[in-house]
Amino acid sequence: VIPIEKLRLTKVIYSHAHCPDGLASAMILKDAFRMLGMEPRIEFLTHGTKEHAQAGISGDGVTLFCDIAPTPDVAQLTRATGTIIVLDHHKGAEALVRSFGDLSVFADEKLDPGVSGATLAWREVWEPVNRETGTHDFLMGAVPINVKEFAYCVGARDTWQTKDPRFQRGQWISKMLMSKPAAHWLGGTRRVELENGAVHDVPERAVLPYLHESEVEMGRALFEAHEEAVRQAVEQVVAYALIGAGVDVYLYVFQEQASGFRLCSDVAEALRQQTDGRTNAAVVAGFAYVVHEPGDSPQLVYSLRGLNGFDVAAFAKANGGGGHTAAAGFEVDPHRELIGRTPYDDIRSRLAAFLKGLNP
């Protein structure tokens, strides 16, 4: 359990950028710290950027990372200072997260299926803070249930628990979250006077469910439109068969959307259904050119999904990225690493080299 007294020293919260789970984590944490009468600065990080490389170095109070971990260099500099809290569930970050000892919680995807950044934010911060302060119980007894359900719906979707009854609702919530800028969900307060006369400024969405039912329904409509984009992406998939570790491994490559809601998970699910009964391991790779900051050169980002047990986290890690067994990714600088070849050629070559390493 992260000590409440350590949470009270938190100055900055870092969460995963361009990700509904990262946004939901930030919403839950903002709410939790408001219960403590605090408002730490919230920033969103993208893996591999200069902002990520510098996050956590400042030494101003405690820094909380959720749904993303500090870089190994920052971890080495700060591990002994007791100024970093890390909550994460990405497989490739396990050793780094656990190295922070009692100020870290790692959710193992096999032991804790469905536990994501949002779930960790609720379980390790929101729920203990609410128990300590009683603020939400006092305001509205049903709210803690709503927060937990919100977190677990997002978690089911983020970790792709397709058999979880909350998965579909998590799809709708995630789609709605990503349809608006983070400031929409994190801004806005409401002054509430309690029965004992105390006055609290709380986030507008802390008093009611984080998403109103009408917003979830909007997310459902957006998701249904999104499914048409998935259908079109599946039609554009280029398939390859590679030999690795003594078996055929299929590679399915398509061009991702550069912004907005990513298609890779849903394309992978559609391909899984199309190839139902096929036992060969497979990798689904969506690629997009992404500009992280205005003025930066575009980077080539690969989103990976594994089918039939293929460990895409290991493949991503071999290329400087990370993630989960079934969902991972990495990025490359196309100006240095893609000279003379297309993303289709590049990802095929990288997977072939990875498979050769498994079965030299």
What are these regions (language model features)?
Residues 155-241:
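Hydrophobic, aromatic-enriched interface-forming segments
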